C-alpha cells in the first residue's frame, strides 16, 4: 500500500519541479534584468517590477491564448508584444532580446528607425520616463506558439520625443 503512495508523491514532486523550472526562466527578474541592461547601456535608470502591470499583462495574454495573435491590447500602458512559433520553449529573455536587437535600426540623432525597419520596441525598452514594467507569457492553445507581453508605465514612444 505504501508503494503507490510513494510513487504518487514522487510524481507530484517531479511535476512541481518541472513547473518551477519553467517559471524560473520567466520570473519577474528574467524580464527586468535584460531591460535594465539595455537601459544601462544608454545611461537610463532601472525599471522595477509592477504587480499591477503584471496583472494587466497576464489578463491580456490570457485573451490571446486561443489565437496567439500579435495584436496590441489598446490599454493605457506602453506595450511590447512577442510571438514565438510552436515547437520552441520561448522565454522572457527571448522576447526582451528580440526587442533590444532593434537598437541597430534606431538612429538617435534623427530619432527614427532605418528605412523599412521597426525599432519602437527597443525605444520603449529604453524610454527614460518608463520606470515600471509588468510582463506575462502564455503557451497558446492548438500548437499556435508562445505569446509574451510587457507593459510599461508611464508609457513611452511619445511622438516627437527621444527615448533618452
Swiss-Prot record:
The keyword Signal applies. One of its GO terms (biological process) is defense response. SUPFAM superfamilies: PR-1-like. Keywords: Disulfide bond, Pathogenesis-related protein, Plant defense, Pyrrolidone carboxylic acid, Signal. One of its GO terms (cellular component) is extracellular region. Residues 34-152 form the SCP domain. It comes from the Eukaryota. Residues 1-24 form the signal peptide. InterPro entries: Allrgn_V5/Tpx1_CS (IPR018244), CAP_dom (IPR014044), CAP_sf (IPR035940), CRISP-related (IPR001283), V5_allergen-like (IPR002413). The keyword Electron transport does not apply. The modification Pyrrolidone carboxylic acid is found at residue 25. Disulfide bonds join 68-140, 113-119, 135-150. Belongs to the CRISP family. Probably involved in the defense reaction of plants against pathogens. PANTHER family: CYSTEINE-RICH SECRETORY PROTEIN-RELATED (PTHR10334). This is Pathogenesis-related protein PRB1-2. The lineage of its organism: Eukaryota, Viridiplantae, Streptophyta, Embryophyta, Tracheophyta.
Amino acid at each position: 500500500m505504501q508503494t503507490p503512495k510513494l510513487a504518487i508523491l514522487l510524481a507530484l514532486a517531479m511535476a512541481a519541479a518541472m513547473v518551477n523550472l519553467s517559471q524560473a526562466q520567466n520570473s519577474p527578474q528574467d524580464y527586468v534584468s535584460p531591460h535594465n541592461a539595455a537601459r544601462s547601456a544608454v545611461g537610463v535608470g532601472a525599471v522595477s517590477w509592477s504587480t499591477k502591470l503584471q496583472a494587466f499583462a497576464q489578463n491580456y495574454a490570457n485573451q490571446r491564448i486561443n489565437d496567439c495573435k500579435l495584436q496590441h491590447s489598446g490599454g493605457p500602458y506602453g506595450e511590447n508584444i512577442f510571438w514565438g512559433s510552436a515547437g520552441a520553449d520561448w522565454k522572457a529573455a527571448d522576447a526582451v532580446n528580440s526587442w533590444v536587437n532593434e537598437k541597430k535600426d534606431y538612429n538617435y540623432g534623427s530619432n527614427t528607425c532605418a528605412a523599412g525597419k521597426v525599432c519602437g520596441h527597443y525605444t520603449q525598452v529604453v524610454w527614460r520616463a518608463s520606470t515600471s514594467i509588468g510582463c506575462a507569457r502564455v503557451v497558446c492553445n492548438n500548437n499556435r506558439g508562445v505569446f509574451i507581453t510587457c507593459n510599461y508605465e508611464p508609457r513611452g514612444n511619445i511622438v516627437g520625443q527621444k527615448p533618452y
